[in-house]
Amino acid sequence: MCERAARLCRAGAHRLLREPPQQGRALGGLLRWVGARMGEPRESLAPAAPADPGPASPRGGTAVILDIFRRADKNDDGKLSLEEFQLFFADGVLNEKELEDLFHTIDSDNTNHVDTKELCDYFVDHMGDYEDVLASLETLNHSVLKAMGYTKKVYEGGSNVDQFVTRFLLKETANQIQSLLSSVESAVEAIEEQTSQLRQNHIKPSHSAAQTWCGSPTPASAPNHKLMAMEQGKTLPSATEDAKEEGLEAQISRLAELIGRLESKALWFDLQQRLSDEDGTNMHLQLVRQEMAVCPEQLSEFLDSLRQYLRGTTGVRNCFHITAVRLSDGFTFVIYEFWETEEAWKRHLQSPLCKAFRHVKVDTLSQPEALSRILVPAAWCTVGRD
């Protein structure tokens, strides 16, 4: 019995010596796990860098600014010179020096020209709430073009009812857009009026020259008549009716003679002339001359815009007279405008009518227009009473 117990004790001891201890097996497994994990790629403990967002999407309204650049870039060289910049952005408020300073402000890389990026960057930084407006204009333009295509499709193959609905929606769209446009134009007119008043506070207004022309105060709405002066056998059709009053015909005749002298470079003073004004012999009119060379392929568009400009300017109270002359080459036009004062002409430059014509000129002229101004005696436009 004791011997058997001794054998079992020896066998158990040998078995324990042959088997690794449990703690050793656990430690080996832990070491193998640690080794395996160390061989795996490990993630950095630092915060992950944000993914590259790619190029930033253009700000709203950029397409409109690019269109402005295209119209201002007269020679299509992809950049605006100072002359092109002043021609396009002149509004009658900023003078040439102020426009030049603005040009160099926008020209951030000091290359003496403004490229598309510089123009977009400047206006985008100053757009404010107009960013949404200009972005909406981009969307509206696309939507209107799409709707015009739909309208054409309906009118080619739609039923009478479909055509009625489309016609109604088209008219309503026009009414809504016109309503918005009227609101914007009212704001433009209010700002222009306020700007004119601010400028007049710094400039003493001159006495009205209208009394010099007519010898009586100006009526509430002074009529203006357009003269299409003949030059080398060519003329531009008049947009208004011929003057019927004898006194007005005399004025037109004298203006025709004056313009003929201007074109022939034979301007002189009649020293024997009796001036009809008694105390205003020093009164002058502002005569503005614009000479424009039109691209042949854009002639029709230019003529349409010119006629609208002449009709609109004729109704401006402070414009005594306006005339347009077509030169012998058929593509060069000269406009003469007689204004009561320089300030009246500058206010006119801010009007929607003048800005619309200026934009058409940018698109249709083959080179920047030549503009000059001189003062002419108001007595030249006075009906003689001798």
From Swiss-Prot:
Residues 286-375 form the ABM domain. Interacts (calcium-dependent) with ADORA2A and GRM5. SMART domains: EFh. It is found in: Cytoplasm; Cell projection, Dendrite; Cell projection, Axon; Cell membrane. Pfam families: ABM (PF03992), EF-hand_7 (PF13499). GO terms for cellular component: axon; cytoplasm; dendrite; plasma membrane; postsynapse; presynapse. InterPro entries: ABM_dom (IPR007138), Dimeric_a/b-barrel (IPR011008), EF-hand-dom_pair (IPR011992), EF_Hand_1_Ca_BS (IPR018247), EF_hand_dom (IPR002048), NECAB1/2/3 (IPR039862). May act as a signaling scaffold protein that senses intracellular calcium. Can modulate ligand-induced internalization of ADORA2A and coupling efficiency of mGluR5/GRM5; for both receptors may regulate signaling activity such as promoting MAPK1/3 (ERK1/2) activation. The keyword Membrane applies. The gene is NECAB2. Keywords: Calcium, Cell membrane, Cell projection, Coiled coil, Cytoplasm, Membrane, Metal-binding, Methylation, Repeat. Ca(2+) 1 binds at residues 73, 75, 77, 79, 84. Residues 60-95, 96-129 form the EF-hand domain. CDD domains: EFh. One of its GO terms (molecular function) is calcium ion binding. GO terms for biological process: negative regulation of G protein-coupled receptor internalization; positive regulation of adenosine receptor signaling pathway; positive regulation of ERK1 and ERK2 cascade; positive regulation of glutamate receptor signaling pathway; positive regulation of protein localization to membrane; regulation of amyloid precursor protein biosynthetic process. Expressed in brain. Expressed in the spinal dorsal horn with especially strong expression in lamina IIi; found in excitory synaptic boutons and in ependymal cells (at protein level). Residues 170-201 form a coiled coil. This is N-terminal EF-hand calcium-binding protein 2. The modification Omega-N-methylarginine is found at residue 10.
